[in-house]
């Protein structure tokens, strides 16, 4: 068992990036507002996005290159499109996840209630971990975080389920009001994660191969599938927590990070019992810390690679981009810290409406001449991919048409 865990890496980094805002904030809100009514959206998003995430490690294993190299081979304009989309979203995404993490740190540690101070502390901690240890430390840290998160979340769901007196209601709901539709799109945008994480996944796969040269293709794909299944299970768990504890409670979530965190944990402890405080607080904080550090690592890696491919060597530097991202995040944080909900909504909706681009680019690349034939997807995965592209494109067009 220990040997199996040691082989895991990029899949758990994927889980770490995926299970933050999409699970803790969006899945919990979905459960609180709709009960289990949006379970269909969670399952469909995970199903139809699966091939495009899978193509990340598959392409890297086939070619020894990242998907960004593949984008450049498809067309320089594909890579430039990625760069523009990434620059638009990465600061907002990093700020959104840091706000939630800082709010939860206030509840868990209680040293100071100043959310700006906690944001600075968290970003500084993440910077130190990444600049000192880079991939190796992040890889090892994530194994601990994911195990802790999974155990504490499953325990919290079990306690909530045994203490709940209401019957399980699984009627599925399709929102009709404009606000509810916007939430649905935001929910699906980051469920289980934005599709650009497939690029991060391909880079992490290459890093894992450097660290462990003997790791096989089968082990890498197994690692990815473990991470993916973990995100699905935990997504359902957080919907269950929101439904069992908060549904029909009469509470309205605040858009302020610290207040949201307080409401989240207090509602749990009031309903489940004060003894559950540590379980919920640890599960919530480790979820968001894992997302924060993973995002802070991945975006600079992709910027370095992208600018290298474009021939702009002077700014193709990991340390340069991680500092830019940290400073940009804290700057946005100071000006928008009272609008956590708005930031999360903007970040998640942007992720959804850009998903068709990543889906089409990844599908085209994995089936192109740039991928050896023996590594190209099976007919079944290709059928699922086409259905996924149709699903994501139709939903995006429909949403944009009703704005």
Language model region names:
Residues 11, 83, 108-131, 147-158, ...:
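Transmembrane alpha-helical segments of multi-pass small-molecule transport proteins
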Residues 147-174, 184-203, 359-371, 395-403:
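Hydrophobic alpha-helical segments and their helix-loop junctions in multi-pass secondary transporters
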Residues 42-55, 219-247:
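Selective recognition of specific alpha-helical transmembrane segments in multi-pass small-molecule
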Residues 29-54, 69-73, 77-80, 182:
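Extracellular loop-to-transmembrane helix junctions
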Residues 2, 35, 62-88, 108-115, ...:
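Transmembrane-helix boundary/entry motifs in multi-pass membrane transporters
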Residues 27-29, 54-77, 105, 109, ...:
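Flexible loop linkers connecting adjacent transmembrane helices
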Residues 62, 79-110, 288-306, 340-342, ...:
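Hydrophobic transmembrane alpha-helices that form the core helical bundles
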Residues 130-162, 175-178, 347-355, 380-388:
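Membrane-interface loop-to-helix entry segments
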